[in-house]
């Protein structure tokens, strides 16, 4: 019996880069096949070929034994294939129902029957166990909720082959469990699934088989993961042993650099108070909706502050805009790097030099292009940013390499005092995480106060000197590194009445 999906010797070349070279593996009906590899290894490129966005330069894609050519996304969908990419694809000013049924809204005599559409979507969402308002506009939803809409859109197409690229990167624990149930149901229903994730727990929980990519090549395939240690997968992905991914080392801390007292904003009603010392890394943990990102955006001047006070090195701090924050040496690496972190149409060099261009002026009039080129080349080499050259458009880089470029932007800033990192390793592979943690520690050694928001509890525990836990828009507690463990943190993060054991 033919495999539901087969990749046969797939190759793809971009200018200066061989993105895929000889990729061959099968996905059976009723199987979840994991794909793992560092950012830039070629996983997402393969899915774009499957989804009709790219055409392979060699090899073929077979669906149910038939060689297929997908000149467009519509052709892929018509063949029973659904691909959910990391970069969410939605219309922000349309409702959940309209996004889910885009192109197939029920109509009568040319008029859309919105009531029928909303009822249909509500019924299907309820059947999937997904709690979303069918009438809510996408722009008003959180990133996690938008991700669920994308997943539901693929499921509504009743596709036989479904590919998921980092589907849980923005989901809460509850939403992740809903997704896992959906994947299990689809497997039992005989669908063939490809599942890309950097999270080992998810690969071992969901996947029947797994293929490892490195530098565009297929370096290993496992028909079963039952007897494959995690260390083996990591070594195959990165080509080396990583004994301590966090490489934490105690540091001498300075005086209090950033202090917040009874800080309030539109989504922060209780008043948040905390300190961060020079050279200290303070991790902020909480469930989705706890208010962590909102607090950081208030500090950075991206959201309105309605109460409380901030001080920087003991001096009152009045930040009314992000420009004020940057001028005072406070920067933010945002959660949504695609929308807020990078300038997608600009080059890698331009993205690295954006913040420090005021230091690169010559005679007050002209940009020092030579100095900018040298700065970009230095950080591309230092942070191992995978790019053909500094002139490459940053949108063509993997998520991990985009994040490195954002961090390089602030490493190049000479007057940096406070660095706020909101989900700095979301959707990034284990090798790139290791390198980014090194950058974070380098910033701390320079005396920067580091505030790191993360939904990955092992990351918070592994990197932070101190952990602040938020719950329902307020600070629920604080733990020193020596007293912090998963149970203690979760007991502070969970709603009152729940416990870590119950979770």
UniProtKB/Swiss-Prot annotation:
Alphabetized CDD domains for the sequence: ABC_Carb_Monos_I, ABC_Carb_Monos_II
UniProt: ATP binding residues: 37-44
Entry keyword annotation includes Cell inner membrane: yes
EC number, as in UniProt: 7.5.2.12
Residues of the ABC transporter domain: 5-240, 253-497
The UniProt record lists the keyword Glycoprotein: no
Main location as per UniProt: membrane
Pfam family for this entry, one: ABC_tran
Function: Part of the ABC transporter complex AraFGH involved in arabinose import. Responsible for energy coupling to the transport system.
Name under which the protein is recorded: Arabinose import ATP-binding protein AraG
Protein species of origin: Burkholderia pseudomallei (strain 1710b)
